[in-house]
Amino acid sequence: GTSTVALIAVIISSILYLLFGGSGHKNLPPGPKPWPIVGNLLQLGEKPHAQFAELAQTYGDIFTLKMGTETVVVASTSSAASEILKTHDRILSARYVFQSFRVKGHVENSIVWSDCTETWKNLRKVCRTELFTQKMIESQAHVREKKCEEMVEYLMKKQGEEVKIVEVIFGTLVNIFGNLIFSQNIFELGDPNSGSSEFKEYLWRMLELGNSTNPADYFPMLGKFDLFGQRKEVAECLKGIYAIWGAMLQERKLAKKVDGYKSKNDFVDVCLDSGLNDYQINALLMELFGAGTETSASTIEWAMTELTKNPKITAKIRSEIQTVVGERSVKESDFPNLPYLEATVKETLRLHPPTPLLLPRRALETCTILNYTIPKDCQIMVNAWGIGRDPKTWTDPLTFSPERFLNSSVDFRGNDFSLIPFGAGRRICPGLPIANQFIALLVATFVQNLDWCLPNGMSVDHLIVEEKFGLTLQKEPPLFIVPKSRV
């Protein structure tokens, strides 16, 4: 039919473009020689972040790949990252949006995927001046601490049993966000029929779709066809997620119209008071839940993995907490007095940044970086994973050693380009202030309250520490532990 003819025309156009077109820029950064049609696609394996780090050893700070018809520039050192995220931040601030996520009504209202439009600036402002202020974060600390206590109670009931720890962490984080956003739990820990399992299925399916290969990302002419139905599936996931909290939003809107309504001082009240429309609220909540839960759960699972492998480090954190906190439960207000805990979080984020290549940027116009030409609409990736393991910056980069951050001013708040797990510049993760709090809180809660071992008497020497690449960097296989009380 007509669509088949159109598809053939697109494929022929792509081939002609690749053979006789190209970027037209002679001064691109160097890179491996591309093959006809597919470019460098077939040269990449399952762990591109690790391959990019190896390519940087050959080609230097920045290099070029041809991914189908797309020109991609990869930055692999802190100096190159500084050029992209600081010096040329404005010109390189646009987003490359994966074809699967180009859902009408979502991208243009998204903090993550939209370009730096007025809507985007307004949403960032709400995050910066309302949601993630120091005052707001401190006022809600008791919520996060209470959810951590509930997590410990749940794990106490699981003593001697095998527990997939990332599911417990994920559930706890969803409830933390549920209370910060809606002032209520989204589900009950350990109940497979509660709201979270449905929510989690939608969320993880979206992440899988984001992590899966879509030929249209490399041959954009195919984008309009949605050949594998990925965009349609993302739209269905979004619809399902919005339905889960749609009723809660409507209920709140009605409640706010009643005289004498007492503000709950949660994110929904802030969003409604800020005049955001339903599309903007849905997109913002989706990204707070999506980015906030999955990336943080993955980071905390990596921290638990490293602590399982390094019991001496666990003992040092425990000793520090005991000295500073004593017998009461650790609180977020204790963190300034727990430097070794803070160093452990930094070291986890150095070795295991939640988004290994950050999120792809796009050049708004042609510019020059490190004497190379970066053409307009070129896709730009920053290898945060490779930068965190760069032997020119870090001594023994593959060793997990929190000590390297003691008496060090290096931080991950976007000023030190050797440590950028949350990005930097105008597109730095807006939730960084709160993510830092609950990563540290969950790690401290585990260490203070629990002992744990691996299932079936497995030695830590046999613990597999492999990565599953995607938008987020997950541990493969997931960490299973057997918890036991320290009390």
Swiss-Prot record:
One of its GO terms (molecular function) is heme binding. One of its GO terms (cellular component) is endoplasmic reticulum membrane. Its cofactor is heme. One of its GO terms (biological process) is isoquinoline alkaloid biosynthetic process. The keyword Disulfide bond does not apply. Gene3D superfamilies: Cytochrome P450. It catalyses: (S)-N-methylcoclaurine + reduced [NADPH--hemoprotein reductase] + O2 = (S)-3'-hydroxy-N-methylcoclaurine + oxidized [NADPH--hemoprotein reductase] + H2O + H(+). The keyword Endoplasmic reticulum applies. PROSITE patterns: CYTOCHROME_P450. Keywords: Endoplasmic reticulum, Heme, Iron, Membrane, Metal-binding, Microsome, Monooxygenase, Oxidoreductase, Transmembrane, Transmembrane helix. Pathway: Alkaloid biosynthesis; (S)-reticuline biosynthesis; (S)-reticuline from (S)-norcoclaurine: step 3/4. Pfam families: p450 (PF00067). Heme binds at residue 429. The chain crosses the membrane at residues 4-24. It is a single-pass membrane protein. Its EC number is 1.14.14.102. It is found in: Endoplasmic reticulum membrane; Microsome membrane. PANTHER family: CYTOCHROME P450, CYTOCHROME P450, FAMILY 76, SUBFAMILY C, POLYPEPTIDE 5-RELATED. Belongs to the cytochrome P450 family. 3'-hydroxylation of (S)-N-methylcoclaurine. This is (S)-N-methylcoclaurine 3'-hydroxylase isozyme 1.
